[in-house]
A protein has these predicted regions:
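A short, polar/charged loop-to-alpha-helix boundary motif
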Residues: 60-69
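N-terminal intrinsically disordered, cationic/polar leader segments
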Residues: 32-53, 59
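Short, functionally important structural connectors and interaction interfaces within domains
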Residues: 1, 18, 47, 51-52, ...
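Long amphipathic alpha-helical segments used for membrane anchoring, targeting, substrate engagement
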Residues: 1-28, 32, 81-98
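Stable alpha-helical structural segments in soluble proteins, enriched in small hydrophobic residues
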Residues: 70, 74-85
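Residue-level signature of catalytic and energy-coupling elements of molecular machines
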Residues: 12, 48, 71
Length: 98
């Protein structure tokens, strides 16, 4: 009984250590989201920190709602990619428990 408990604690500590490594790795992986027309590009890390936003100069002459929509689409695409990347990395550690 206590042997199982020791083994479970050991596994939990190992998983915690691996999770720290994954978290650090996610901080260095960059993903991009691009608007449908390519006029806006957002770069963020896989831990969902925005690194850069690029707006094509031709987009700047558009109406505000067009610019807003392009930024929204690019951000959402980058977030989706960051979530997918993060989930894949975490699944490798947790065995699909996430």
């Amino acid at each position: 009984m206590f042997g199982n408990m020791k083994e479970m604690l050991k596994q939990a500590q190992n998983m915690k250590s691996q999770m720290k490594k994954i978290k650090k790795e996610l901080e260095s992986i960059e993903v991009e989201g691009i608007s449908a027309n390519g006029a806006c590009k957002v770069t963020m890390t896989a831990d969902m920190k925005t690194q850069n936003v690029e707006i094509n100069e031709t987009l700047l002459s558009s109406e505000a709602y067009v610019i807003e929509n392009a930024i929204k689409v690019a951000v959402n695409n980058a977030l989706e990619d960051a979530k997918d990347t993060s989930a894949k990395k975490l699944k490798a550690v947790t065995g699909g428990l996430t």
